[in-house]
């Protein structure tokens, strides 16, 4: 399991730990990842993803998982998130066609 957010693609970064005497040693800055279960309104089922806390705020800001995924670029999303996005788009399209008929 990689240390990468499935929604924002945030991953580990490399930097320096600087001591009082200004000695620099390499270290890794890891993202704050949490396992979260989102409820998709379009799919009507829970979706489990490993996301950063920054992504949690973004999902909340955009009105839930469906709104976030529909506005997100496919390049930033994990393959699992892209698959969920496609399912949401299909459900929304069928719901719109059913409403027109």
From Swiss-Prot:
- Which keywords are on file for this protein? Ribonucleoprotein, Ribosomal protein
- From what superkingdom does this record's organism come? Bacteria
From the Swiss-Prot or TrEMBL record, what is one GO molecular function term? structural constituent of ribosome
Cellular component per GO?
Answer: cytosolic large ribosomal subunit
Which Pfam families does this chain map to?
Answer: Ribosomal_L28 (PF00830)
Any one Gene Ontology biological process term? translation
Q: Which NCBIfam families match?
A: L28
PANTHER family per the UniProt record, alphabetical: 39S RIBOSOMAL PROTEIN L28, MITOCHONDRIAL (PTHR13528), LARGE RIBOSOMAL SUBUNIT PROTEIN BL28M (PTHR13528:SF2)
Please report which protein family the annotation says this sequence is part of. Answer: Belongs to the bacterial ribosomal protein bL28 family.
Protein's name in the database: Large ribosomal subunit protein bL28
What is the native source organism of this protein?
Rhodopseudomonas palustris (strain BisB18)
